[in-house]
Amino acid sequence: MLFKGIRLAVLLSGMLIFSPMTPAQIVLKHPGWEWRISETGCAEQLIFKNKQRNDTVPFFRKGDHAGPSFYAKREGKEIRAPWIPDGYASYRSEIDGVLCCISYTKVHWQPALRVKLTNESSVPFQPQKAGLKLGIDTYMDKYPDWFGKYFPTLMRNEKTHFYGYLQTPSGHTLGLVSQQPVASWSVDYNLGYQDPAPFWFMGHRIESLNLDLLNALPLPSRHPQDLYELKQGESKEWTFLFINVGKLDNLEYAITQAADIPLIDIRQTSYAAHEEASFMLTADTPEVKVTNDAGAELPVVLTKAEGKRWIGKVKLEDAGLYTLSVRSGNKVAEAVWTVHHPWQWVMKKARENVARYHQKPTSHAESWYGFYSAFLAARYFPDKTLDKQLSDYFDQLYNKLHDPEKVEPLYFKTRIQNTSTTIGMLADKYEAQGNLEDLKKASKLADWMIRTSQRDDGAYYNHGTVYTSVIYIAKSVLELAVLERKQGEQDPFWKDCAERHFLSAKKAIDQLVASQGDFQTEGELTFEDGMISCSALQIGMMGVLEKDAETRKYYTDAMLKILNSHDCLTQLRVPDGRRRQGTMRYWEAQYDVQMLPNMFNSPHGWSGWRAYATYYAYLLTGDEKWLEQTFNAMGAFANLIDYKTGQLRWAFVVDPHLEVKQACSADTKLNFSDLSFGNPHPKLYDTRKFVIGEQYVNMISDWQTVNTQDNDVHELFKCIGETVLTNAFVIERPNGEVVGYNCRVSGKGNTLTVKADEKQIVNLHCNLKQPFSVTFGGKSRSLPKGYCDWAFGQSGY
């Protein structure tokens, strides 16, 4: 019995300590952690105690997002019920005759939450959603506070259980697992602004992570399909463990130590046709099968490793999706590999889709982003008729948006990302066609932008806001400078241009480095995917271009610090090749495909920004993890083109159950080639309601005439063109194994023969610990011990 004003603590080895700080506040203590619970029954903070430092998981302390709290959604409205004390560290609440009981406790030495739902009403309970608003503080609104906030990076529902993790930009990972099936999950996205009133656009922040214990159908087939209701008198129970994972590399080990669930670990999620895929599995007695999308099984070799770990191998077939299914006892798990078509096929199909989905002259460069794909494909795989059609239309669009004499934008001049994007397109057009007039236009546009929009400290800006990392202003200028340097070998005019533009970009990138993570971006400030990834990639590109070892290391270190902080926004562990390496953007659908509300679009066109950065990280460090991440990303990107039909999709939506509204009627006042400015709200048009979840979303620029930005998906094919389309990589691993990416490697002794997977792959990068003689493309070179650089050809920079 606890008496008012008296603290009671019982300490036994490994036991939980209950310590009331006030009559209403409770602190649950354990040698490794401490959980503080407020007088409302919601958590205040969860502190994990480590030898070097403590890691604190903050919870919202007041308002609608405090939690854990019981909530239900029905008829489009959410109800949140307050807790009533129901025993020590236990609480209850009720909605519509459904009783929810929770207890804060310990399971397997981990802080845990036991949850029980009981339908005490006289009718079935069939909400749209019902469960817990978890309450962990996910609201990233200012620097440097956001380094301690938790982003909901991965939530994974299997038919028999649930797991996932949240991660901070500073690198701490919080695992979450339940051995009971959970219907679904969702997040609450904030509202942004009205334009025009009364219509709302969504914001750039996340207010809550919700564990939806019950959820209406449809749900993805991998989810439990029977948790859409609670019958009269029925009860269901769940236990959620909160696991101090620490570094993300510990995720699978930490989860399997605390929960008896089969866990699939696939480090490479994308392959070329007929390659052998491997996976690691933690399970007791697994039954494993791999099927293609027609349901045919492929032979799997499963080998027992240490403890409960198993290593599996399977030879995949033609382009498509391959599902790995695991059963261990009464638990099941699933993973997906992608096998991509040759990169040549991908780029040709991307170009075809540039013509299918209209490129539109608007206030936003995203609406004509497809010209990147058009000019890259034209450079490597000429198609006289289609290339002329697209080139002529680009010229028409360019002339509508620019003053031909002054060579500067006619509209929205402060949206300098439009200008830098046009510079990049003109550079690619020049490389495809060899017309020096395109390079001259790009050079003059760069001069205009630098003159009007670069501060003394180097930052490119828009009305006082640093815009260097809105898309990637400096990278586009560097792409131009690289081409000007080549021309400058014969012409001093171009040499001067190259030097001027290179120094401008360098100043801008040095300002990013000096910002120490305190970056700025377009729109509502948050720890924003593109702001972080574009800063990392531009610093990385500068490092690649630098020849001085000390300067190169300076940029490398700065880039890696930023790139590592971006991990929390990236799907680095999801066992699904369609999504792997996608970045977790969530406010683009309203602008790109006129769909509301917010949703995780991953991969989305802007996922390409991180992939440039991981590519540069590999070139600068030789660490294979960055190359693996790059190729996983390219596989996910390639799969946005339907491998059966060649049709381009806009993005993959991660949320498992979303009730959306999408515009379904075209604007009748404008044609595709007419100027269109601003972001027309979806509700200005006829809309339809429907449910989506874990699926691709189609493009709309084939029918919507006004400004939409779904063509930003072409950033992914630009990224493919710059990183893997013409490049192969050979790596000697620490154990002496030599592997190839985009190539096949055979060897005898200290001799390696490398055969490219495709004929346009003419550059070979070698990362070797021992000296080797390497043959590639009919040529041979002797490479010294520790060689890590381009051995044949060059990267393009």
PLM regions and their residue ranges:
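Bacterial N-terminal signal peptides that target proteins for export
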Residues: 1-10
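N-terminal signal peptide c-region/cleavage motif recognized by signal peptidases
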Residues: 18-19
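Beta-strand-rich N-terminal accessory domains
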Residues: 23-193, 234, 239, 744-756, ...
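Trp/Gly-enriched beta-strand surface patches
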Residues: 147-229, 295-299, 771-774, 781-784, ...
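Short, solvent-exposed loop/linker segments at the N-terminal edge
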Residues: 267-275, 363-364
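Aromatic/hydrophobic beta-strand junction motif of beta-rich domains
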Residues: 273-285, 754-756, 764-766
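Short, aromatic- and glycine-rich surface loops/edge beta-strands on solvent-exposed regions
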Residues: 288-290, 318-330, 797
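Glycan-recognition and catalytic cores of secretory/periplasmic carbohydrate-active enzymes
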Residues: 311-317, 323, 332-771, 777-780, ...
